[in-house]
Amino acid sequence: MAKESTFNPEHQATHTSSKVVAALERISEAFRVMLWQEAKQYGISPIQVQILTYLLHYPEKLKTVTHLAAHFNMTKATVSDAIKSIAAKGFVKRKEDSEDSRSHSLHLTREGKALARKVERFAEPMEISVQKMGPEKQSGILEQLLYLIQDLNGQLVITPQRMCLNCRFYEKKGKLHYCNLVNAFLKAGDLRVDCPEFRMPAG
């Protein structure tokens, strides 16, 4: 017997897991809509909106095609094509590595920074909705979403993310979260989706 589709409303009625998946799919649709609406205003693509936003906030060591590809779960070729387009428009420039001429980092030009500060606001409607939930619900949702992301990492659906649960400094002590870098327990709301001190586990 074939497995029922997650997106069959009749199946969803008696399967909470399918309703959760369907709800997450609706949220992903909302992000696609918000990205497209922002991108079309400036004649760029949704991934270019995300790249500009990324380059505005991340440190130089992470401003490479390799890191961008891992962050957005795309091939390096796809990311390179997107960068070539916004570089041609004068929004991004490449900086050669002083120690390795084959390597380079990516930087926003003055025009690129100005555009990035505009387009990075694409998710504001989602932020407003989340803020209405209150701190306790936000923390609970954050914790469960991080567990979901971690499981998808394990299934190789997406690349490992720079979050607490994947970090060598993270430890689960019973039901509590502990960071061995700062030697402190973390509340669910303190967990990070992307931590600047992230280190991959050894081995």
Q: Which stretches of residues belong to each language-model region?
A:
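Long, low-complexity, charge-rich intrinsically disordered regions
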Residues: M1-E4, E171-G203
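N-terminal leader segment of winged-helix/HTH proteins
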Residues: M1-Y42
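Pre-recognition alpha-helix immediately N-terminal to the DNA-recognition helix
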Residues: K19, A23, A30, Q50-Y54, ...
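Short amphipathic alpha-helical boundary/capping segments
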Residues: M34-S45, E127-E136
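N-terminal helix-turn-helix DNA-binding core of bacterial DNA-binding proteins
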Residues: W36-T75
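Canonical helix-turn-helix DNA-binding module
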Residues: E60-H104
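Charged, amphipathic alpha-helical coiled-coil/dimerization segments
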Residues: S85-Q138
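Terminal interaction helix/tail motif
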Residues: R121-R168
